[in-house]
Amino acid sequence: MGGVGHTVLVVDDDDSLRMLCRVNLELEGYRVLEAPTVERAEELLRGENVDVVLLDVHVGSGDGFKVLAELNDERVALFTGSFEVDAQRSAEVDAVLRKPFTLTDLSETVGRLAAREAGGSRFR
């Protein structure tokens, strides 16, 4: 199981999407945390050792980029649907997962990011 020992935080206001990510990533051995709001994401990042963040651009009434601006060293994949990620924003993240994405895309992206050397949550 490639995910053993790695923690993934899924930040999205879509309950079904978070559940889909959680179930599939847990089957691969990842520990998965879920945040339906920017505030919950910030709380989890302060209290948990997170390796990979899957971050929706628009999280409810919050702004996913607000969380992105607070991250120090987590590996980040940005979720986006109709929103076009400009070159500057793309440079701030490690990967972009365009909705709808396949489970293979999810698995490969998280696996690639989790395999990188990094030191867990560095939330400011």
Where are these regions (language model features)?
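Active-site residues of response regulator receiver
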Residues: 56
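A Lys-centered signature of the CheY-like receiver
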Residues: 99
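The feature encodes the CheY-like receiver
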Residues: 60
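Charged docking surfaces used in two-component/phosphorelay signaling
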Residues: 19-26
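Acidic, metal-coordinating helix/loop segments flanking the phosphotransfer/catalytic sites
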Residues: 34-52
